[in-house]
Amino acid sequence: TLPVTLLLAVYATAVALAVSCVLGVASAMRPGGVVDVVSRTLMQLASAVPGFWLAVVCMLFFAANLGWFPVSGYVPLTQDPAGCVRSLTLPALVLACGELGVLIRTVRSSVMDALQQEYMLATQVKGLTRMHATVTYVLRASLSAPITVAGIQMAKLVGGTGAIERVFALPGL
């Protein structure tokens, strides 16, 4: 049904946006550093791996071997909210992996652009630390583009969750 698909798409977009903000800001703060190289490599891999294959691998590893998540099925939100989150977490993580490549690049470039603005020089003159200035000013200025891209990707996810829903036996579209 559509509500399950929408819930999964919103959950996956929120996860992708949170992870991409952390990795994108860390990459932009030290271009060419370890975090930058690792995150760029991971986003290339995440974009290249088919979602249904990643779903099967994650299901075998995290659900069957480790038992962290249910292997398949869905618990309605009205019946058990915690069970619903638990049943949608692994599919949302798999869907988020496909979206991370674009979002990390968008966050990284937006933050790097914001770090070059003149108001960053003013924050140094005021005596603010780079981390404080980044959290206070840079994030506010640079998150509009990633949020816009995430909204567009969420619309794409609503139509593209069919294979993942089938692998995880979710009653979606």
Name each region found by the language model.
Residues 36-40:
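Membrane-interface helix-entry/capping residues at the boundaries of transmembrane alpha-helices
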Residues 44-57, 150:
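Hydrophobic alpha-helical membrane-insertion segments
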Residues 2-35, 51, 64, 78-173:
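Alpha-helical transmembrane segments of integral membrane proteins
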